UniProtKB/Swiss-Prot annotation:
It comes from Shigella flexneri. Forms an efflux pump with AaeB. The gene is aaeA. NCBIfam families: PRK10559.1, RND_mfp. This is p-hydroxybenzoic acid efflux pump subunit AaeA. The lineage of its organism: Bacteria, Pseudomonadati, Pseudomonadota, Gammaproteobacteria, Enterobacterales. Keywords: Cell inner membrane, Cell membrane, Membrane, Transmembrane, Transmembrane helix, Transport. The chain crosses the membrane at residues 12-32.
Amino acid sequence: MKTLIRKFSRTAITVVLVILAFIAIFNAWVYYTESPWTRDARFSADVVAIAPDVSGLITQVNVHDNQLVKKGQILFTIDQPRYQKALEEAQADVAYYQVLAQEKRQEAGRRNRLGVQAMSREEIDQANNVLQTVLHQLAKAQATRDLAKLDLERTVIRAPADGWVTNLNVYTGEFITRGSTAVALVKQNSFYVLAYMEETKLEGVRPGYRAEITPLGSNKVLKGTVDSVAAGVTNASSTRDDKGMATIDSDLEWVRLAQRVPVRIRLDNQQENIWPAGTTATVVVTGKQDRDESQDSFFRKMAHRLREFG
């Protein structure tokens, strides 16, 4: 009898342990797959692609790669002597047409005062037409001078905002063309996180919800707020034919992979460039309030740690 009871007890304990293990694994799976979190998140920032508005030789580079610069600080300079000469030439043209316009104005005024009693109407009209032509040439010369002045000012390339110079690829003596990107500027205090959430987890993601960000390789947890959720993503299976009609790919996979939707998260505290733009992180959306770690069960703490390993 005792042997039977002992065997029954062992069987019951085994069944209970199996059931508990199954429940734990099931809860872990649900928590892992349905809670709003992702390992596919990246730090991002506002980046300004700096390109000159004039072409010429680079005569001076005032910064080095990865340097923190202030708004208005000179980054590099382009061939100022050439543009200075162009401005002087334009100023000389303006001075010439100003004198010429004054002469033609006096001549036209004299002929208009004398009238048709002293000369023909054709001569009077000709003087007025010459004056108008010279005035137009003067206006054109003034516009050319203003453009030359603007070009001279733009030979000095300045930082449009506070930030870090990155990917600097200009050197003294190189020729740079107008519009070609010379350097990228990562704006200071503009860092945020883009979390690519699976569509199955968007139910728990709303603007204003709190989020935890753990940079890859770090135990530090940053706090943030969901700023916005992307309004749409590209549909790779839909295209257009030459008449504009929609063409849908007929392939339907047995296992459908969830689309990933970008979620923008605003950081509570800017971290400067400790985690550069493009580096990865794990993001957990905790809901309307921050997670109270002191009330987390051992299971939840383990689940949070397991997220770091995928």
